Amino acid sequence: MSSYKYYDLIRKPIITEKTTNISEQNKYAFYVDKFAKKLTVKKAIEEIFKVKVKKVNILNVKGKKKTFKGITGTQINRKKAIVTLEKDHNIDFAGGIK
């Protein structure tokens, strides 16, 4: 699989207070394509960020029900991947920011 396909697989990193705390344990969270499997997520992270992945956990996140101006709707369903890296590897999302 070429590297541009991997960029379609990984939607975006999840940067919240909770994911910042687990990043100290070498775990990082990403929203991924809803058809993504553990093995393809592992290959994509290794190819894009040039790191060694130890383990991948996948979660299906059901969309919440929201009401806006009296109209009830639902947010989209998403798939989340928690990626554990080997000890000597890490990902720096804010590398070029000064």
Curated annotation (Swiss-Prot):
Q: Which HAMAP family match?
A: Ribosomal_uL23_B
Q: Which family does it belong to?
A: Belongs to the universal ribosomal protein uL23 family.
Q: Which GO terms describe its molecular function?
A: rRNA binding; structural constituent of ribosome
How is the subunit organization of this protein annotated in UniProt?
A: Part of the 50S ribosomal subunit. Contacts protein L29, and trigger factor when it is bound to the ribosome.
Question: GO annotations under biological process?
Answer: translation
Q: Provide the function of this protein.
A: One of the early assembly proteins it binds 23S rRNA. One of the proteins that surrounds the polypeptide exit tunnel on the outside of the ribosome. Forms the main docking site for trigger factor binding to the ribosome.
Q: What is this protein called?
A: Large ribosomal subunit protein uL23
Organism this protein belongs to? Rickettsia akari (strain Hartford)
Q: Which InterPro entries match?
A: Nucleotide-bd_a/b_plait_sf (IPR012677), Ribosomal_uL23-like (IPR013025), Ribosomal_uL23/eL15/eS24_sf (IPR012678)
Domain of life per record:
Bacteria
**GO CC terms:** ribonucleoprotein complex; ribosome
Q: Pfam families under this entry?
A: Ribosomal_L23 (PF00276)
UniProt keyword Ribonucleoprotein, yes or no: yes
Q: Where are the transmembrane segments?
A: none
Q: Which UniProt keywords apply?
A: Ribonucleoprotein, Ribosomal protein, RNA-binding, rRNA-binding
